[in-house]
Amino acid sequence: QLMANFDDHWLLYVAALFHDVAKGRGGDHSVLGEVDARKFCKDHGLNQENTDLVAFLVKHHLTMSNTAQKKDLSDVEVLKEFAALVKTPRNLTALYLLTVADIRGTSPKVWNAWKGKLLEDLYRLTLKYLGGEAPNRRQMLAEQQAEARRILRLYALSDDVQDKLWAQLDVSYFLRQGPSDIAWHTRHLYWRVDTEQPIVKARLSPIGEGLELLVYTRDEMDLFARICGYFDSKNLSILDAKIHTTSHGYALDSFLIQHDSHHEFYRETLSLLEAELQDRLIKRQPLEPPVFGRMSRQSRHFPVRPSVDLKPDEKGNQYLLTISATDRTGLLYSITKLLAQYKVSVQTAKIMTLGERAEDSFLLYGQSLTSQKLQIQLETDLLELLSI
């Protein structure tokens, strides 16, 4: 529908032709490609407005994907920054269409419903912002909670059933989780907020692809690594992870898992995941060494040069870790296991796979990160880990 209603949609084809034209020349291919695109448009008599649009798309063809998959879309500052970049609804729509086409055209394995939802969410939120509807955290919080309560009433639960659980959760939980997820978590936890046993629940993802898992247990430094270790042992890939800590010291973590959920035995799969992961968390066995899977022929011959970037976030309270490396089985678990060894806890994990490349982002917290010496040591160990 957006494509059909977009004026001069042929401009998107021009941008698509030039978006990767400068790869392999050295330097930033987006910037170099913008120069080529401007020259082409000028040589072929395009007016300034259309030339600027094509150049904008070529220069920023990776920006929307990176913003949607690596940043927290519940953060008002993220929306402000992205809206300031795109400036107009026309630029936004064009960039959205090009981004979707670029990802889907890369490989069938690269595109999934989760990436589609992230991009659509960013598009709709930014469109509202450009239309004058500036995000209001208080209003967003009220709307999220009201919709979650409405869903809970459909299960014949009273309006105050959630009070004890919700009192332990901070604002960021309600802004980062959707109403459907909040209601799902509440249905399983409201009557056992202070449980001594780990709780693990699984369901088919509402987005229509993959599985969602909820883990609720007393928080521990290596908890995230333990969970990742289990998924790794089952050859399950994490698409997204949202980690929350309640005010009384419990971890409320949710995971989106890539999995073929369209088979007749999916209920048995959900039950098995719940039972096995709960059993692993109860037994608390030592973390097993990661087992790296075989890499594809392309990865062996054209490995991704590993990179690690660790820096304080905008508020200076936590640290943002960005990692780029060749994707392989066991990679995420090996990273989280190393972080646990440094007594660093993961607050948020954004997992992005682009073909053979893994680009993961983590929001971290830990006293060891306040030491510059330990920061350098952690970065060095991560680079060694990521090297093939």
What are these regions (language model features)?
Residues 77, 81-388:
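Regulatory modules associated with amino-acid/nitrogen control
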